[in-house]
From Swiss-Prot:
The keyword Membrane applies. Its main location: membrane. GO terms for biological process: ATP synthesis coupled electron transport; electron transport coupled proton transport. Forms a complex with DabA. It is a multi-pass membrane protein. One of its GO terms (cellular component) is plasma membrane. It holds the Pfam family Proton_antipo_N. GO terms for molecular function: NADH dehydrogenase (ubiquinone) activity; NADH:ubiquinone reductase (non-electrogenic) activity. Keywords: Cell membrane, Membrane, Transmembrane, Transmembrane helix, Transport. The gene is dabB. This is Probable inorganic carbon transporter subunit DabB. Part of an energy-coupled inorganic carbon pump. It comes from Bacillus subtilis (strain 168).
Length: 505
């Protein structure tokens, strides 16, 4: 009773602090409020973040507090979104100083991250849909922040249309669930008793609606266009977009994981995500624009996350989306220093290097096979083993095989071993923390898993062949096709920002 009362009090305090940050953002809109108030606003933003950290520390006991659902996943994602939002807003204080939409930016940003945090705390399906819709509206307005620029307005229009389709898909899925189960409470909807009353066609229909609702924000093929167009948004907006919002699909699928049992919807999700991995990787390789490279990377990474969800590895998907969010936010915030020096590496001893390459190939194969044999009947383990072996091989080549002499190879081995150790520690801690909260669903048939494996192997083999035949016609066709996929539509491109003329005339 004491723990329940404590959590209830903390939740009340959290909402008070969240409202205070929202009021602070609205006050900052008034032109008479000095720009220096932004630092006070940043201080107020830290208050709900600190309270969410206290809730996270007390999330050992899960349960419902009114229409809100508190468990380790909800508390973790609330803290994560607010922490990323706080860091990016603090970064933006100087980065966007002088921008005509400076005040509006902080208000919209606070509104968007606040709505996202309340989405993951919602234990009522109606509140979840409402706050997720508010998050998508806030993101659309952030993309359209520079409304005087026709390109930004066009990008917001494209994003808004797709977001509307995604939101209606989620809305109809929740209405269907209520009609079938008679429950609005999330914890009651996903029980075995409630889901047992669903017919096979009803379950499949709801699954397909949820899949459509999550692949659009995740920018999966064929709905990746909005993320490509949104590159015109300010860099801090791109940072929160890629770090804390596009990965929402993994959280939604995790929440409704008991509904999925390896049927046709999971297979469709597997195929679309696998295709997106190949397309996203290709876009990131052919684009020369730094932000477009990151767009391609995000499409591919979200594809991997959804593959994990489709295979029932929801804890791995949550770990993936958190680490990806931290990594991608860092990459966007350091975009200003992305134009570095391109030094040609000199490899003094090619024979020695290729001996190390072969050693890395053998080591990667052994570790990948060993990882797979720990659970040979698990489809996720098979794909993970493939990705693990490939990642280790690439990292070995870059850090060890072509290291600068003995010292360089020792340093590379140290970095590689340290990174692996840190990853496994993080994976173990998150798994121990989340395994009681997250349901592990039935996996798709092994035939579907093998199709995904074949697609990934085909993509890897195609990339290797193309890299060695750059003068072929096929290379030119593939290259131009990937460039076209990664470029915005003509309406969303201007050779010069003509809207600036009105400010100098």
């Amino acid at each position: 009773m004491l723990v329940s009362l404590s959590l209830s009090s903390l939740l009340t305090l959290f909402f008070i602090m969240l409202m205070a940050s929202g009021i602070s953002g609205l006050l900052f809109l008034h032109p008479r409020v000095p720009l220096s108030f932004v630092r006070i606003h940043i201080g107020i933003l830290a208050l709900p973040l600190l309270v969410s950290l206290l809730i996270l520390a007390n999330s050992g006991v899960s349960g419902n507090v009114g229409p809100w659902h508190l468990d380790s996943l909800a508390c973790l994602m609330t803290f994560f979104v607010l922490a990323i939002g706080f860091i990016i807003q603090r970064f933006s204080v100087r980065y966007l100083m002088g921008d005509r939409s400076y005040r509006k930016y902080f208000t919209l940003f606070t509104f968007t991250t606040g709505a996202a945090s309340m989405t993951w705390l919602s234990g009522d399906l109606r509140l979840m849909v409402l706050f997720w819709g508010a998050t998508l509206v806030g993101l659309t307005l952030l993309i359209r922040l520079n409304s005087a620029w026709q390109v930004a307005s066009e990008a917001a229009k494209i994003s808004g249309r797709l977001f509307l389709l995604s939101w209606f898909s989620l809305f109809f899925a929740m209405m269907w669930l209520f009609h079938a189960t008679g429950q609005w409470q999330l914890s009651l909807v996903v029980t075995n008793e409630s889901l047992a009353g669903l017919g096979e066609w009803e379950r499949t229909g709801i699954q397909l609606l949820i899949v459509l609702a999550v692949i659009i924000p995740a920018a999966q093929w064929p709905f990746q266009r909005w993320l490509v167009e949104s590159i015109v948004a300010p860099t801090p907006v791109s940072a929160i977009m890629h770090a804390g919002l596009v990965n929402a699909g993994g959280i939604i699928l995790t929440r409704f994981s008991p509904l999925f049992h390896g049927g046709i919807a999971s297979i469709i999700l597997l195929l679309l995500a696998s295709i997106s991995v190949l397309i996203g990787t290709g876009i990131s390789l052919v684009q020369v624009d730094y932000k477009r490279q990151l767009v391609g990377s995000t499409i591919g990474q979200m594809g991997f996350m959804l593959i994990q969800c489709a295979l029932g590895a929801y804890i791995a998907a949550i770990i993936h989306l958190i680490l990806h969010g931290l990594f991608k936010a860092t990459l966007f915030l350091q975009a200003g220093s992305a134009v570095g020096r391109h030094e040609v590496s000199t490899r003094t001893n090619e024979r020695t290097s290729y001996l190390w390459v072969m050693a890395g190939r053998i080591l990667s194969l052994v570790i990948g096979v060993a990882f797979w044999l720990t659970a040979p009947g698990d489809g996720y383990h098979l794909i993970s083993a493939l990705i693990l072996g490939w990642s280790l091989s690439v990292s070995w080549d870059q850090l060890v095989a072509f290291g600068e002499g003995r010292i360089g190879r020792i340093a590379g081995l140290t970095v590689l071993g340290g990174a692996a150790l840190v990853y496994f520690i993080i994976h173990h801690l998150f798994y121990k923390w989340l395994h009681t909260t997250i349901f592990q669903s039935v996996q798709p048939p092994m035939s579907a898993v093998m199709i995904v494996v074949c697609l990934l192997l085909f993509g890897s083999a195609l990339g290797t062949w193309v890299a060695r035949h750059r003068s072929s016609v096929f290379f030119a066709v593939l290259y131009l096709w990937l460039v076209r996929l990664g470029e915005a539509k003509p309406k969303s491109v201007e050779s010069h920002p003509d809207y600036l003329k009105q400010y100098i005339s």
